[in-house]
Amino acid sequence: MAKKKSTKRKKSTRNPEAAERNKRIAIVSSLVVLAGAVFVAGAMGVAELDRAAASSIVSGTPEVVIHWDTLSDGSVWMPRQEQERLNLAIARAVQGGRALSAEPLKEAVLTLQSSGWVRGVPEARWTSEGQIVLDAAWRVPAAAVRVGSREVIIDWDRYVLPLDYAIGQSNQYYFTNTDAPLPQTGQQWVGTDLQDGITLLRELSKNDLLEQVAGFDLGSGADSGVISIITKRGTRIVWGGGPGRERPGEKNTSVKLDRMRVLYERAGLIDGGVPYVDLRGKDIMIDSNPGG
């Protein structure tokens, strides 16, 4: 068997400058590799977080919390049935929405905004518990307008609310003989006659003269815009043009209010205890037998 031939290595001459240069290159290369490894690991961690977050965003029916408007005692004034109707409509609108996404918020806002109950655009937000919270500027019922056999509820700006009742069942001051026809829910009832009527309603309220009032007749035909106050006794007090919009020969609002106070002080009734009173002229006109 032939023996392997042994060879001797020649010792190389070591260059100190080259060795130092190679050392620096090795250190820099190590740092670059380490940074790359950290970057990749970090990227993988972010991706895992994204996947974990995405897995928690699932389709479903988020719980909706509506901040209702309240009275001074903290109680909600909106009828329970109407609260339930709105809750159901909004729950249907957001059903199947992805939690923490914008789409359910948009649907909730659009549904509440189109209900006729709010002014402007409602605000919606997600809570950390996955609930949708809704805040809005609510339209408050002010009166009813009689249309046919129904009483349609309006707010103080004459916007039609999604409520109507049989005649005498609304528990609101009513208006009859409006010039303009009934608009759609959520739209404003136009016409200076109804505007004047609401203004008079405010004036009587500020002067504590509403207790015996049932409603207002806005006049028709030649007397359109001539407002008459209808008392709970069924008597009539002719007021005239709206406050600040008096017709020629009419006394102003302060005089008419003073006359109502005088009648109340004498008889304990704002109509003075008679069926017909006219507040417009130089003197109070009283008719004890208007049908005679």
Regions found by a protein language model. Name each.
Residues 1-70, 89-292:
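Charged, solvent-exposed interaction patches on well-folded alpha/beta domains
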Residues 74-89:
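Histidine-centered catalytic/metal-coordination loop motif
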